Amino acid sequence: MGEDISKIVIIGAGQAGATVAFGLRRNGFAGEITLVGEESHLPYERPQLSKEMLRPEASAHKSIKTRADYEEQSILLELGCKVVRADAQAHSIVLDDGRQLAFDRLVIATGVQPRRLSSAFQGAHRVHYLRTLEDAARLRADLEAGKSLAIVGGGVIGLEVAAAARALNCPVTLIEAADRLMSRSVDEVVSAYLDRAHRRNGVDIRYGVAATELLDDGRLRLSDGGTVPAEAVLVGIGVTPNIEGFEHLDITDATGVRVDAYSQTVVPGIFATGDIASQPNGGGFGRIETWANAQDHALNLVKNLMGEAVPYEAPVWFWSDQGPINLQVVGDAANGRRIVRGDEHGDVFSVFRLDANQQVIGCATVNSPKDMAVARRWVKQRSSVDPQRLADPTIPLRDCAV
């Protein structure tokens, strides 16, 4: 890193932001590092909000690092602050209390926020969104009270919360506008398994409908005219990027802050990482909203901030724990030739996806972490496999590559 770089400001005190801050110190950056976050808490990882913090044995949340760690590494924390404007010409940001912070390099790691239902649902105490520790605590209180829960959205958040709510013996109805669960991430085989597993666990699943009205009698009206029990409502219908304060810089696109393979925006000296980054992906650009990407993309950005010029090329990988179900997905698990390994009607199987050259382009595993360990390596290396051998679970995976 050049000698003129003495101040780095990171906006967003979550996993990606904290990873950049500590990564810079590990790589020898001796200048000033300031981490700015809207929440008053020390940075923490958000996956625990829909997992550990809602389970029957829930404990206090876990921070990424202790306050002493930040002090030891001379990382300045500006928590409970919101950035209202970033000035690329003046190389400074303005906080909501009027203070200005100067920077030589600016890292945007502001993440995303839950997409909201229509204005008819705004302000209702029964309606929950899951973004912060306070959100999780409020939802947890309703679940512990045994309230009936209507979940709007059949994605990862909705399914994880459904499993947690059933573990607390809450009646659960899940409402999904599409015709299957997790339709953006997995194929029909995995969606069908998730449907069977959650119904077996007591979840009432409704497809092809939307929430239209919150009724005073503790029910929720649907677009087909029916109603479902809804003493509490959890909304998980996607997210929107936190770009407030950066719109005027012309660094955003339809999905977030646009960056190249080096995490650089079109404005010199301004970078983005984590969920907010609209990054090269599958021939286009888009956000990758996973724990692994927030971690690995941030670590790769550190290399570039230190002057190494290393492009980010890791395949998409995420996991979801839904009660006893461990689902993992790598690469493109919804397109290409489908090879099912194991019994898709059981509770342990894998679905591989191959291109026309028999190269592995994606995989989804259900309760099969060993298969995923191999699949991640194959997807990264674009390994070719024998489809017939791959479909035979009696043949070790290592013997399926060609």
Swiss-Prot record:
Enzyme Commission code(s) on record: 1.18.1.3
GO cellular component, one term: cytoplasm
Coiled coil: none
Cofactor: FAD
Recorded GO MF terms: ferredoxin-NAD+ reductase activity; oxidoreductase activity, acting on NAD(P)H
Binding site for FAD: 16, 51, 83, 131, 275
One GO process term, biological-process aspect: catabolic process
Keyword NAD included in the entry's annotation: yes
Triggers of expression: Induced by p-cumate and repressed by CymR.
Keyword Oxidoreductase among UniProt keywords: yes
Catalytic activities: 2 reduced [2Fe-2S]-[ferredoxin] + NAD(+) + H(+) = 2 oxidized [2Fe-2S]-[ferredoxin] + NADH
Keywords: Aromatic hydrocarbons catabolism, FAD, Flavoprotein, NAD, Oxidoreductase
Record-linked PANTHER family: APOPTOSIS-INDUCING FACTOR 1, RIESKE DOMAIN-CONTAINING PROTEIN-RELATED
Protein name, per record: p-cumate 2,3-dioxygenase system, ferredoxin--NAD(+) reductase component
